């Protein structure tokens, strides 16, 4: 289709999008065939530039504040018109995709991008259905115009770029953002607002399925191990980041994966390594003179990424969904070295730790966080993406856990034997052994030891894991120092939890002083 002197490229194939991206100088090919691009000064999400339009459907339903920022409806209309006119004056790319693999819960999306590579990214991450919108639902529009420059005083934005969600108009406006992760997370936020109304829990988690049909969920913030641990050659991958849990089903919202690449190795992450080939996109990965990716080079960012479609994963759930989960795992990266490698949680503890979302920002995906590592609490293990009040999601989680009798575990992928800089981080093979024990059912009804202060129950034995690693206190040379660190962590938990209005039983399920 042609508009004036420019072309609108609609539903191009992967090969065609790669060809267009190369011809337009948007990227280069790595020796694996993956398209390599740079995203400029933004190499992660920009939370301060994310807004939701305030209108009757959102006014009283959203937890407004520094995460969910209000944007006026009239300003949105004016800015959308400006961005659309700018985009229509040049070549651009349109693809029709779905968000949500379950037939009852998919959103049909018209994705318009200024660049070929961001359209390819969307084709990697969203679902490319055999038939678009068979149920004839109202269509969402994503308008992603990377080279538009917002004017804050005129447009009402915070900077030269923005991500604005308009639920009333079913529109997502992304302007001035070359980091493509904004697009996938914007549609995740849309589903996170809509799904609870259908009694479906939206989750920032990975999911895989065993030979017997048993499903495991992996909740966690970026860098805690969701993508790595769910990419298991002995199981079938459902997805690595965004899922919905309804009665009888866990379904992927996406059609691809978005893996962190820092220190990626074929030995530790063979599934991801093999997926980075023709049709994949590498963001901010440095190539050597032979076009070989150097995943140890963080000169552009610690948040280098690979986007690839699920078709690049040999062992995957063809239906992109599974049954309800036998095991629910909360991944936390504990910088203090206080938490054990695995704890078995009851329902109240599950609610407490889900609401707390304790972890560390590791090579953070957010702009402005730098390369440093710091502890954080992120409600629902994904606070930036959940627009409703946190309690609504926690109630749905408990309802789902109770309904299916899912077992819940807290798994520490962070430090032991001392805090960051003193102790050592649990190795990926150790954590994989913990996960394997959970999935085998070995920890169901296991004999446990109670850890005071942090108020957790630890199995006394885990197949494949050294027994001395299980109780973190035994790993510290200075036991008094451990006790002080545990009290310090407990204080952080208690202080953070004051903002939640929940039952006394849930409050009592957390660390106690």
Swiss-Prot record:
Task: Return the EC number.
Answer: 4.1.1.49
Gene that encodes the chain: pckA
List the cofactors: Mn(2+)
Name the chain's protein.
Answer: Phosphoenolpyruvate carboxykinase (ATP)
Q: Which GO terms describe its cellular component?
A: cytosol
A Pfam family this protein belongs to? Answer: PEPCK_ATP
Q: Where does Mn(2+) bind?
A: 185, 204, 241
Q: How does it assemble?
A: Monomer.
Gene Ontology biological-process entries: gluconeogenesis
Query: One GO molecular function term?
Result: phosphoenolpyruvate carboxykinase (ATP) activity
């Amino acid at each position: 289709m042609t508009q004036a002197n420019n072309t609108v490229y609609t539903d191009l194939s992967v090969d065609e999008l790669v060809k267009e991206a190369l011809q337009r100088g948007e990227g280069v090919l790595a020796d694996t065939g993956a398209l390599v691009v740079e995203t400029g000064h933004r190499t992660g999400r920009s939370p301060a530039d994310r807004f939701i339009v305030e209108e009757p459907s959102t006014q009283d339903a959203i937890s407004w504040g520094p995460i969910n920022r209000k944007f006026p409806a009239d300003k949105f209309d004016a800015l959308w018109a400006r961005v659309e006119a700018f985009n229509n004056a040049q070549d651009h790319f349109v693809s029709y995709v779905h968000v949500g693999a379950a037939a009852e819960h998919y959103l049909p999306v018209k994705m318009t991008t200024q660049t070929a590579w961001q359209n390819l990214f969307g084709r990697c991450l969203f679902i490319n259905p055999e038939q678009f919108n068979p149920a004839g639902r109202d269509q969402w529009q994503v308008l992603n115009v990377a080279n538009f420059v917002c004017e804050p005083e005129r447009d009402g934005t915070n900077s030269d770029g923005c991500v604005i969600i308009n639920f009333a108009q079913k529109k997502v406006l992304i302007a001035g953002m070359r980091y493509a992760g904004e697009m996938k997370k914007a549609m995740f936020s849309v589903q996170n607002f809509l799904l609870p109304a259908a009694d479906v829990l939206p989750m920032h988690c990975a999911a895989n399925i065993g030979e017997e049909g048993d499903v495991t969920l992996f909740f966690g913030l970026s860098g805690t191990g969701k993508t790595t641990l769910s990419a298991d050659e002995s199981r079938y991958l459902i997805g690595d980041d965004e899922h919905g849990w309804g009665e009888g089903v866990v379904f992927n919202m996406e059609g691809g994966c978005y893996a962190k690449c820092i220190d990626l190795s074929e030995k530790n992450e063979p599934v991801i390594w093999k997926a980075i080939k023709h049709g994949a996109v590498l963001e901010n990965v440095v190539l050597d003179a032979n076009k070989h990716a150097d995943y140890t080079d963080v000169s552009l960012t610690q948040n280098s990424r690979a986007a690839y479609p699920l078709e690049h994963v040999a062992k995957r759930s063809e239906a992109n969904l599974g049954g309800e989960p036998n095991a629910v795992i909360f991944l936390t990266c504990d910088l203090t070295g206080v938490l054990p490698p695995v704890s078995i949680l009851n329902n109240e503890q599950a609610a407490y730790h889900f609401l707390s979302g304790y972890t560390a920002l590791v090579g953070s995906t957010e702009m402005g966080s730098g390369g440093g590592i710091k502890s954080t609490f992120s409600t629902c293990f994904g606070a930036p993406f959940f627009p409703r009040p946190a309690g609504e999601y926690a109630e749905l989680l408990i309802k789902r856990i109770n309904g299916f009798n899912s077992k819940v575990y807290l798994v520490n992928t962070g430090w032991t034997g001392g805090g960051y800089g003193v102790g050592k981080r649990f190795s990926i093979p150790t954590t994989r052994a913990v996960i394997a024990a959970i999935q085998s059912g070995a920890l169901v009804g296991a004999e446990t030891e109670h850890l005071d202060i942090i108020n957790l129950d630890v199995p006394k034995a885990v197949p494949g894991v050294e027994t001395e690693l299980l109780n973190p206190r035994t790993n510290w040379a200075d036991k008094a120092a451990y006790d002080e660190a545990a009290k310090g962590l407990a204080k952080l938990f208690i202080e953070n939890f004051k903002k939640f209005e929940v039952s006394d039983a849930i409050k009592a399920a957390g660390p106690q002083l």
